[in-house]
Swiss-Prot record:
Transit peptide, start-end: 1-44
Residues at the catalytic site: C689
Gene (UniProt): arg-6
Post-translational events: The protein precursor is cleaved into the two biologically active enzymes, the kinase and the reductase.
One of the record's GO molecular function terms: N-acetyl-gamma-glutamyl-phosphate reductase activity
The keyword Zinc-finger appears for this protein: no
Protein name per Swiss-Prot or TrEMBL: Protein arg-6, mitochondrial
N-acetyltransferase domain span: 336-488
Superkingdom per UniProt: Eukaryota
Reactions this protein catalyses: N-acetyl-L-glutamate 5-semialdehyde + phosphate + NADP(+) = N-acetyl-L-glutamyl 5-phosphate + NADPH + H(+); N-acetyl-L-glutamate + ATP = N-acetyl-L-glutamyl 5-phosphate + ADP
PROSITE patterns: ARGC (PS01224), GNAT_NAGS (PS51731)
Length: 871
């Protein structure tokens, strides 16, 4: 149904630029020629260096994200890339981080214009000189003595920044005089304070064209040569008005704006949210002033310009990822609505909008007929003033749900976030809605986020939200299964266009995802945390679309004494939809369960007979077996016996190795095992900790194996359990590392079985408490580069919230307490036919308890990551 707007979407409220096609990923030198100012040999960027930096930047996001932003940023003249305002505190406390970030930008050929202040330093100098700083309405009162101190200080701070950049190989040019023309703001009130009347753009353009980053101070001069003090925020705003950059960045120690609950605000779309925000009691003081000033600035700039408030350590993430890291503020766009074609001022323009990006020789004629259809039928259209986005909804009628009949959005429409605005309006006016999307639509992940359920039929996906009646959902699914888009009849423009372009083809039913407890899921490719499609992960997370359970799940934990049991108790305690009803431990029976706060729970010593009877009565939704290897069989058989007697089917999750090789059990590694299988499962074998990290570290390269991978694994001593042994004796482990089971370890067999390829595994235990590090040597069947291999991993794990692909080799000390796996290193030998990859995992979390909870969420019908802090 939807036009192929190949874009990437920004997290939640943010949507960004078009995804870079494969042919454009190299970012050829020709990109530089598109710039509006000349470049010289001094500033030409070596593509090898550029590629290396792209790879490094990919540690904060995917390579695609980095390249798409580079493509966007280099599509404008260099001085229009970004204006970055640097506060005095940043120069004092975060100079190294700032310069490192600027070096990245410089190396990839991006030249931001930097303007800095030095307010905190000036206050200290004045106090040391016995001068008390004076402010009126937040503006510094500046007399001759203050100005003299300020001028010397600003020159000193400017030189400090320039010298630091030069030390790092970044050519920087201090532009400290003649950059801002100004008049007195109010000489009687503020003294030597300026109101900027002009900006010397030529000096900035010359510096950049000669390969230098321009570094400006916030000092201005009158036509008579009098120096005036200007607030750095004001100077940055005036620079932005003169240069009209894509980005205006305010570097801040806080890293963004925060709401009443102390949560960082990810994005503000001023056209839709400004009045509401300014009416909120918590929007006051500096926050209120900042939002007001930014609105005044953006009102004078192109709609594509945005303002980011960000910490200097996160500058790359803000600029080069969909998610960003600080607070993004943009104008957005207000929507208009029409219920009749006569309300459109220009029908020809409407036709052009409906036909754009639509293929087919008869598209124009089909659109004409569609407009005739709209003349005779009720509809409501939602669009912005520039028609960058248009949605048409046919209202609900007897026996039919409201239908989103067509939606078309341009690149500019995504850039200005109109897609989210439209769906917000739709949900306000239409309690339930049905729509269809092509399965290869690059925005499919975004549509999943907007929907409650979906069903797939050869190349098409039907989505819906707000339909509560199960019979209606079943009827809808059946209709779509039998008829596809044709079920929507003449209301669906894409269906008309398809019919006009080709004869109907026989279609077969594929998998579907619904709000049923254990639906079979379609094989879609949804990317990570910010809701955009990557089309590379064959088994993407299902997210909140899996949520169907309408009550808390009742959980029984058998064997709660160990480290894993304790971690799982903590996770369930913070889970909004799970309750621990029973915990069983022979040693702790009769004692109060500590660390669980939802209700008082007393340890029991449950027998298999107790378990059987509880299953018969249907008291438990999920049994978690946290017992040593070889112990849980009587309890599992008791659950089976209870099932036979009652028909009640709870979920069993076994944390031991007892059933990992039993094909009657589902292996619970959601990132590699089809999630639809886990959703349907009633008995799940939780993978081992070593095995999880090893499989994730090897799996993307299985088709490229040229021999047996070797895994050198080292675990903290918590992996040896609580029962005393040499492997968890800290004194024995101090200054020591203990190898064990160097051949034939159960995890060696487990990984080999799951990957379908033999591996060699050599486990060791070390003196730290938790965390595993794998060094994996993988022979390849062809020559490959480090960059290619890393991209392979990024593509395979796109969208996974518990797998993080990084550039450098990950470290154990950074994985402790985290709920996922980090994979990095990607060192290739000189032949190109062997790669060494490193992986880390917290053996008690993603290696055990977190993995268990992830499987519980899927099998019980909750959002996959509910209750799990993601990476």
């Amino acid at each position: 149904m939807y036009s192929a707007c190949a874009v990437a979407l920004r997290a939640g409220a943010r949507r960004v630029v078009r995804r870079v096609p494969k042919s454009a990923r190299a970012l050829p030198r020709a990109a530089a020629a598109r710039r509006q100012i000349s470049t010289t040999a001094a500033r030409s960027t070596d593509l090898t260096t550029r590629g290396m930096i792209v790879q490094t930047l990919s540690s904060v996001g995917s390579k695609r994200e980095v390249q798409q932003y580079l493509s966007l940023f280099t599509s404008v003249s260099s001085q229009r890339f970004a204006v970055i305002k640097v506060g005095g505190a940043i120069l004092t406390d975060y100079l190294d981080e700032l310069c490192a970030a600027l070096k990245f930008l410089y190396t990839v050929g991006l030249y931001p214009v930097i303007v800095h202040g030095a307010g905190p330093q000036l206050n200290r100098l004045l106090e040391d000189a016995g001068v008390e700083p004076q402010f009126e309405e937040g503006i510094r009162v500046t007399d001759a003595k203050t100005l003299r101190v300020a001028r010397d200080l600003f020159l000193q701070e400017n030189l400090k920044l320039v010298n630091k950049l030069e030390e790092m190989g970044v050519h920087a040019q201090p532009l400290t005089t003649g950059m801002f023309r100004a008049d007195y703001l109010n000489k009687e009130k503020w003294g030597l304070v300026g109101k900027v009347t002009g900006v010397n753009k030529q000096a900035i353009e010359t510096a950049i064209s000669n390969g230098y980053l321009p570094i400006l101070t916030s000092m201005a001069e009158t036509d008579d040569g009098q120096i005036l003090n200007v607030n750095a925020d004001v100077a940055a705003a005036e620079l932005a008005r003169a240069l009209e950059p894509l980005k205006v960045v305010y570097l801040s120690e806080k890293g963004g704006l925060f709401d009443a609950g102390g949560q960082k605000i990810s994005a503000i779309n001023l056209d839709e949210e400004y009045e509401h925000l300014m009416s909120q009691a918590w929007v006051k003081y500096g926050t209120r002033l900042k939002i007001k000033e930014i609105k005044e600035l953006l009102d004078t700039l192109p709609r594509t310009t945005s303002v980011a408030i960000i910490h200097p350590e996160e500058l790359q993430k803000e600029l080069f990822t969909d998610s960003g890291a600080g607070t993004l503020i943009r104008r957005g766009s207000k929507l208009q609505a029409s219920t009749s074609l006569s309300e459109f001022k220009d029908l020809e323009a409407l036709k052009s909008v409906l036909i754009r990006d639509r293929e087919g020789p008869d598209a124009k004629e089909t659109v004409e007929k569609y407009l005739d259809f709209l003349k005779e039928n009720p509809f409501k259209a939602y669009f912005d003033s520039s028609m960058n986005a248009l949605a048409i909804v046919l209202p609900a009628s007897e026996g039919r749900q409201a239908t989103l009949a067509t939606l078309t959005i341009t690149k500019s429409g995504w850039l200005t976030n109109i897609a989210d605005n439209i769906f917000t309006a739709l949900k306000k006016e239409h309690p339930s809605l049905v729509w269809t999307v092509k399965e290869d639509d690059e925005n499919l992940g975004w549509f999943f986020d907007k929907a409650d359920g979906s069903i797939t039929r050869q190349g098409d996906v039907m989505f819906w939200y707000g339909i509560e009646n199960g019979d209606e959902i079943v009827k809808l699914m059946k209709d779509f299964t039998e008829n596809g888009r044709a079920m929507l009849g003449n209301s669906n423009l894409e269906s008309r266009l398809r019919q006009a372009a080709s004869k109907p083809a026989a279609q077969q039913v594929r998998g579907y995802s619904t709000l049923a407890r254990r639906p079979a899921l379609p094989k879609f490719s949804i990317s990570n945390r910010r809701g955009y499609l990557t089309q590379t992960n064959p088994n993407p997370p299902v997210g909140k679309q899996n949520a169907s359970m309408d009550r808390p799940a009742r959980v029984a934990l058998i064997g709660a004494r160990g480290y894993t049991g304790q971690e799982l108790i903590r996770l369930i305690d913070s889970h909004p939809n799970m309750e621990l009803h029973h915990v069983s431990s022979r040693e702790l029976a009769g004692k109060k369960l500590e660390g669980y706060n939802k209700q008082e729970v007393i340890y029991e010593n449950l027998s298999p007979e107790d378990v059987r009877d509880m299953e018969k009565r249907g008291e438990i939704d999920c049994w978690v077996m946290a017992l040593p290897n070889g112990v849980c069989k009587p309890f599992v058989e008791a659950v089976w016996e209870g099932r036979k007697a009652s028909g009640h089917k709870s979920v069993i999750i076994d944390l031991s190795a007892d059933y990992r090789f039993d094909n009657k059990w589902t292996y619970g590694l959601p990132e590699l095992v089809q999630r639809s299988n886990i959703i349907q499962a009633t008995q799940i074998a939780n993978p081992g900790c070593y095995a999880t990290a090893a499989q994730l570290g090897i799996s993307p390269l299985v088709p490229h194996l040229g021999g047996m991978p070797h895994v050198f694994g080292v675990s903290g001593y918590s992996g040896a359990g609580t029962k005393p042994s040499p492997k968890n004796d800290v004194e024995n482990l101090t200054n020591n590392i203990i190898p064990y089971s160097l051949t034939g370890h159960i995890h060696e067999r487990e990984v080999s079985s799951q990957l379908g390829a033999e591996i060699a595994f050599m486990p060791h235990v070390a003196v730290w408490f938790r965390g595993i590090h794998h060094t994996i040597s993988i022979p390849l069947n062809k020559s490959m580069t480090s960059r290619d291999i890393r991209q392979l991993y990024q593509d395979r794990y796109a969208g996974e919230k518990l797998v993080k692909v990084v550039g450098e080799a990950p470290s154990v000390k950074n994985i402790g307490g985290k709920h996922g796996v980090e994979i990095g290193g990607f060192e290739v030998d000189k032949s190109g036919r062997r790669v060494v990859i490193c992986a880390t995992i917290d053996n008690l979390l993603k290696g055990a308890a977190t993995q268990c909870l992830q499987n519980m969420n899927l099998a019980l019908g909750y959002a996959e990551y509910e209750g799990i802090p993601t990476m």
